[in-house]
């Protein structure tokens, strides 16, 4: 099974994380398929960048996000309050 989860990076006592798509059997910091964002909880305000189009693609093909990633994706607006993909609004112009 493919999961979207956090991969720890950064220094000792100063963690930052990458949102990665990985096989569920791979170690936390091991091999991954694609980087779809990053999260830095140490900075104030907390920094969160997500490639929303790639996350929607992976969710569409069956990737399962971890509980923490679900919470972060709700903050960004990729998932709605129920944890389902939010509708995409077309950009006019």
UniProtKB/Swiss-Prot annotation:
InterPro entries: Ribosomal_bS16, Ribosomal_bS16_dom_sf. Keywords: Ribonucleoprotein, Ribosomal protein. The keyword Acetylation does not apply. One of its GO terms (cellular component) is small ribosomal subunit. Coiled coil: none annotated. One of its GO terms (molecular function) is structural constituent of ribosome. Belongs to the bacterial ribosomal protein bS16 family. NCBIfam families: S16 (TIGR00002). This is Small ribosomal subunit protein bS16. It comes from Roseiflexus castenholzii (strain DSM 13941 / HLO8).
